[in-house]
Amino acid sequence: MMPYISKNAVIIGRDRKFITDNVTVEEPLQISIENENRIYNVSVIMRTPVDDEALATGFLVNEGIIEPDKIIKVSKRSENNVCVSVESFNEDLLKNRNFYVNSSCGVCGKTDIENVFIKSHGIVRSQSRTDHSIILGLPDKMMKNQKIFSYTGGIHAAALFDLNGNMISISEDIGRHNAVDKTIGKMILKNVYRMEDSILQVSGRAGFEILQKASMFGVSIVSSVSAPSSLAIDVAETFNITLISFVRKNRMNIYSHPERIL
């Protein structure tokens, strides 16, 4: 399935024009777990249909439902169904969550926000630093690699960089939290389970769910082009993550642990 399709539109300005416009596809994805020959339907996620295996992997790990080293295989059983076979999983956590996730909300189904803090792998220990000029250059680097955005102008992105500003992984999705799950999921599928000396750059704002997912992967710096939320700042403070927002060409705001930025 293509991540974008053409739709008819009408432009109204000085003259009425009929055009064909590219729009980002939003479709449901069923995510399942297979364990001991039994299938568990975990979640239906509204997403853009690209990198589905990475999305399912990142979602399940970032939600604390599975541990990355327990994954046996990830398979796409149909166009809108991905199944992750695992040695074991967190059955209690699965029972305590209503897993319908729309493309704009990654935390909507959680019955207790405190549960999100419980499943983290601990605070980030890395004290490695990077120069502010590297942070300022990340949004443009990410934008140049946003292939779907160049066609539709309506899709989020998330990218992992090393502390020298080299891109490691990038993903796009109509949901910003999905883009993060995809980006982290790609690394997990390469058997990389934690990256403390890394920067997560996201389009849009830095909400709670973005910081929660970053903490699960051990990311030390999160950078966003728009505003943070109060709870995102709280998570960053708690897990020793440097949170930077309003990143522009010559300025940025640092909301937590500024000592990592030179």
Curated annotation (Swiss-Prot):
Mo-bis(molybdopterin guanine dinucleotide) binds at F246, V247, R248, K249, N250, R251. The keyword Cytoplasm applies. It comes from the Archaea. One of its GO terms (cellular component) is cytoplasm. The active site is at C105. It is found in: Cytoplasm. Pfam families: FdhD-NarQ. InterPro entries: Cytidine_deaminase-like, FdhD. Keywords: Cytoplasm, Molybdenum cofactor biosynthesis. Its main location: cytoplasm. One of its GO terms (biological process) is Mo-molybdopterin cofactor biosynthetic process. GO terms for molecular function: sulfur carrier activity; sulfurtransferase activity. Belongs to the FdhD family. Required for formate dehydrogenase (FDH) activity. Acts as a sulfur carrier protein that transfers sulfur from IscS to the molybdenum cofactor prior to its insertion into FDH. This is Sulfur carrier protein FdhD. The lineage of its organism: Archaea, Methanobacteriati, Thermoplasmatota, Thermoplasmata, Thermoplasmatales.
